[in-house]
């Protein structure tokens, strides 16, 4: 399951993300953050960290540097 999610994120990064251009207000981007958190923390914790990060991605959050912990 973990490898499938990482593959799906990779497909998104390769084929869909270039169509919208650089729109993420964070570094690393939310999709890169999700891949790194899944690889570092495993499925459940990685999904949790990814969901929290995506919920912070809105116009009222300043964004900036937010590495995977």
From Swiss-Prot:
NCBIfam families according to UniProt: membrane protein insertion efficiency factor YidD (TIGR00278)
Gene Ontology CC terms: plasma membrane
Membrane topology, from the record: Peripheral membrane protein
Location, primary (coarse class): membrane
Name listed for the protein in its UniProt record: Putative membrane protein insertion efficiency factor
Compartment(s): Cell inner membrane
Keywords: Cell inner membrane, Cell membrane, Membrane
Highest taxon above the source species: Bacteria
Family membership: Belongs to the UPF0161 family.
InterPro entries hit by this protein: Membr_insert_effic_factor_YidD (IPR002696)
Purpose of the protein: Could be involved in insertion of integral membrane proteins into the membrane.
């Amino acid at each position: 399951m973990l490898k499938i999610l990482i593959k799906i994120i990779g497909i998104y990064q390769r084929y869909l993300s270039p169509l919208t251009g650089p729109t993420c207000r964070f570094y690393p981007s939310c999709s890169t953050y999700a891949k790194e958190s899944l690889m570092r923390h495993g499925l459940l914790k990685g999904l949790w960290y990814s969901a929290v990060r995506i919920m912070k991605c809105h116009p009222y959050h300043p964004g900036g540097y937010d590495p995977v912990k």
